[in-house]
Amino acid sequence: MNISKIVYAVLTAGVLLTVVPSCNKDDNNDVNNKVNSNETYSFENEDAISKAKIAGKVAPEIIPWSETYNDFLVKVGSFSSKIATAIGCEQSKNTAVSPLSVFMAMSMAAECAGGETREEILNMLGISYEELSTNIQELCYECNRILGYYDEEDKDKAKNMIKCVNSLWIKDGANVKESGIESLTTNYYSDVFKMDFLNSNVNELVTSYIKNETRGFLAPNLELEPSTLIMLMNVVYLKEVWNEYGENLGLTDQKYDFQNYDKTKTSTKLLRGDYNSGKALVTEKYRKFYTSTNSGLDLTFYVPNEGYSVDDIYNTDVLDDKTSYVYSDSENRYHTRCIFPEFSASYDSDIKEIIKSLGIKSLFGGCDFSNLTDQDVFCGQIQHVTKLEVKKEGIEGAAVTAVMMMESAGPAREELKDVYEDFVVDKNFVYVLSRYNIPLFTGVVKKIEL
């Protein structure tokens, strides 16, 4: 079956998780009791249930949903579109960006910064410090949760989860302020490490930490410079299934000719998603619809119309468009399912220059980091690493963002006819993974491989 449509897909999955530090923390607020070192830190063989128990200590009360928090999420969504399109898509491969991970890492930088440096970071994020400090705990809380039902007797069901873990890595002997550390551990539930960055095993330890937090899914070598004084790091991990019983999605009976970005075609069977309420949105440049996972993550596909490409629609105007789907009219109630390919995507690069292009200057030369340290520091690198897999079994993704600071420098209708439609994703596409307007991963798929 020949396919002539180009596909732009947005995979949106924001999920709730109870915020938790990556190692057990007691209720003692003494900063020194929260600090780990090269010699004392040992990785736990932890699971999602133990994470949830720890989270009960740091977030014992659920903050009621408010209009203020909803407005905050809208601004997080706007930043997500801005950073995703600024990073763009690599020409030769599928790309994944985690706006949530970048937002968290840069928010921690804003917490540590002062003066002009803080102001520039906040302007890039599109929020005020008051908005950030008021809402960041709830954002952390919502991005750390076990997905789906589980009980103590069935720990396998707790493997589906979303985690958003923050950490502060400090050079052993660095002059840092306990008040700054306390802000990160209290508001961002950050782990704290004092490290000898000259030690030959420091990169191995950081890699092990990331691997531990992502259940082995992601294990990059960040290649820390010996001159590193402070590192602010965020790790995001997501694992989810399509349905309550963890069953694989079925494949189409016939093969489709998926058109890749370079105009070549890949003949393959596609996955059949479940029907969701609504009719695909069609605009001049693209059409879009979504498929959902068991716990409500939405994978939205943007498919360019004839004469347009993913380059024409991978922009903030499209990603920020809030036009609603049509769910029914005077005669019909609409149901649509997505027919889409399995795919994988990744990213691994220093995004410092991209962050500069968004208006941040002082962070990279003689910056004000006075809420954490009075030493002269500058940001030498912002490494962003991601990996995402969308398969018949479910979705798994992970991301790391590391900011490295160096020394110096309406009413229901009745009796409507049900209409069922297919939304076929049959060409290269853009995706966003989010839930509750919190984008976790965004990128472009230009080619699928069998």
Task: Give the ranges of each region predicted by the language model.
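Non-catalytic, conformational "gating/processing" segments within enzyme and secreted inhibitor domains
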Residues: 92, 131-306, 327-415
